[in-house]
A protein has these predicted regions:
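Second-shell loop/turn segments in exported
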Residues: 38, 64-76, 132-140, 161-166, ...
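Asp-based phosphoryl-transfer active-site loop
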Residues: 100-115, 162
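C-terminal cap/substrate-recognition subdomain and adjoining C-terminal extension
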Residues: 33-44, 72, 171-259
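A solvent-exposed, charged loop/short amphipathic helix patch at secondary-structure junctions
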Residues: 120-137
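Extracytoplasmic/secreted proteins, especially bacterial periplasmic and envelope-associated proteins
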Residues: 80, 84, 100, 133, ...
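Structured segments of extracytoplasmic/periplasmic soluble domains
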Residues: 84, 88-95, 115-119, 149-159, ...
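Substrate-recognition element of Asp-dependent hydrolases with the DxDx(T/V) motif
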Residues: 110, 146-178, 192-193, 235
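Non-catalytic pre-domain segments flanking phosphatase-related domains
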Residues: 2-106
Length: 259
């Protein structure tokens, strides 16, 4: 974050694209839709789309808070991706480039922590103010299995980095939340947030970077420090595009699309 959000109407279009099985790196995912519907029949009913999203996540309500279920379709899809990733990472860790230190890169929102409850609270209508208010009062739960995968990678000798589009002002909130739900709290050298006021010199695009430029440029910077990024994990195409990773893993997220 910050992130350009889809309107409620576009949410329906994005979810419909996911249902049609758009794929990236071998995993189904939501994509933006450019064509203009010719009639109402081309647009999924928004209530139905939201209900489908809730069913996919196995919506469970406790004390007014919405949680994804560990036996949901979402959790099962994640488990398959994570099992494949662990197998491939285990092989990569045995065949790292000479002299390079192995590393994995994780996005934060809907890759490391789950925004599902927040999205339902705000009607899938992200604003910086509502997001900050949420982070001030609550922690987002870990994405099923990703905390264990990160810990496993660290135990196997890989360094874990996070690259997020969240603003620099949310650094303390992000570190607190990650640590609270099972991740090893990252220091400043291992957690990259978007600093529009003082962008790093290694990003030529500075404050005007697109998400792809910012994230791929930051991965290039990590490589320049002597790391081999053997796995890059994200829930958006823009988390993964631009190279500078040996393998990329697309996690499911039908709630929104970020270019």
């Amino acid at each position: 974050m910050p992130r350009a959000r889809l309107s409620r109407r576009s949410l329906a279009l994005t979810a419909a694209a996911a249902a049609l099985g758009a794929t990236f790196y071998g995993v189904g995912a939501a994509t933006a839709k450019d064509s203009v519907p010719r009639s109402d029949k081309d647009i999924p009913n928004l209530t139905d789309v939201v209900n489908d999203i809730k069913a996919y996540y196995g919506d469970t309500v406790v004390d007014g808070e919405h949680y994804a279920s560990a036996d949901s379709s979402y959790a099962r899809q994640l488990a398959g991706i994570e099992a494949k990733a662990e197998s491939q990472l285990a092989h990569a860790l045995k065949h790292t480039r000479h002299g390079a230190r192995p590393a994995i890169v994780l996005d934060v929102d809907d890759t490391s922590v789950l925004t599902y409850n927040y999205e339902l609270e705000v009607g899938f209508n992200y604003t910086p103010a509502s997001n900050q208010a949420y982070l001030d009062s609550k922690d987002m739960p870990a994405v099923f299995g990703m905390d264990a995968l990160a810990a496993w990678a660290q135990d196997q000798g890989a360094t874990v980095f996070w690259i997020t589009g969240r603003p620099e002002a949310q650094r303390a909130d992000t570190v607190r939340n990650l640590a609270a739900v099972g991740y090893k709290a990252p220091d400043a050298a291992h957690l990259f947030l978007k600093n529009s006021a003082n962008p790093p010199a290694y990003l030529p695009c500075g404050a005007t970077c697109t998400t792809i430029e910012y994230k791929s440029g930051t991965r290039a910077h990590i490589e320049s420090l002597g790391y081999d990024i053997i796995g890059n994990f994200g829930d958006q195409y823009s988390d993964l595009s631009g190279g500078h990773a040996d393998k990329s893993y697309k996690l499911p997220n039908p709630m929104y699309y970020l270019p």
